[in-house]
Structures are given as structure tokens and as C-alpha cells.
Amino acid sequence: MTEHDRRHAELLAAFGAAFNRHDVDALMSMMTQDCVFFTLAGDGVHGNELRGQAAVRAAFEATMRAFPDAQWVQGPIFVTGDRGVSQWTFTGTKADGSARIEAEGCDLFTFRDGRIAVKNAFRKDRPPLPANRG
């Protein structure tokens, strides 16, 4: 792994840790001002396309409100050049307690100037579990 790739891998590990702390300020500090986030689902073939810090921040905050106990259990991280992949398992209970989600996923990243320019999220489409399942 090159030094360049190592720095990007460390960035992705820190990004995942910030998600698990629900630290949106830290997340946004790791993204470019003109960042793009392609959501898990949406009207477009790539999900919804959110552009810029304000839109991406709002989406991250909404996820954390919707799933107050959300965690992304980090799996392998792969980096080559200006592209990266982070595998994870998402777990979270809906805020109203009605259901729990547990599913594997990954993010595809594009880096620019030492930050994340694009985050493209993918997750297995699994039915919600009963909320009382641990």
C-alpha cells in the first residue's frame, strides 16, 4: 500500500468511527465543501443525489435521528489511488421502536485533496426485524 493509499484508508477508518459516535461535525470535516452523497435509496438510479455540505449534513443528521442507536460495524477497507471501498454492517432501531435493521453494506468513495468528495452508499435490502431482537 502506498503512503497515499494508507492516508486514505486512515481517513475512511476515522470516518467510520465518527459515524459510530454520531459526530456529524467530524464527518463533515472529512468531506470536501462540494461533496456529493448518493443515498441508499431514492428516485434516481443511484438513489438520491445530495450535493454540498449542508445537504449531506442534513441527511446524516436525519439518519441519526431516525436510528438513535445506529452503528456501522467496520469491515474491510480497500483503497487504490483516489477511490476507496468501506464494507460495514449497519444495525439500528427506528426511533419509534417499531423495527430494527441489521444488514451489510458498503460505501464507494472518491477522494480529492485528502478529503472525501463522493460517498456512494449501498446496503442489502433486508426486511426490518422485530424491534426486540438483539
What do the PLM-derived regions correspond to, one by one?
Residues 23-39:
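Short, well-ordered alpha-helical segments enriched in acidic and aromatic residues
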Residues 36-50, 64:
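A short gly/proline-enriched turn/hairpin at secondary-structure junctions
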Residues 8, 52:
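Hydrophobic (often cysteine-bearing) scaffold residues that line and stabilize catalytic clefts
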Residues 14-15:
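Generic hydrophobic alpha-helical segments
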Residues 1-7, 23, 57-134:
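A beta-strand edge to alpha-helix "cap/lid" segment located at domain peripheries
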Residues 22, 51:
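Residue-level signal for the nucleotide or nucleotide-sugar donor/cofactor binding architecture
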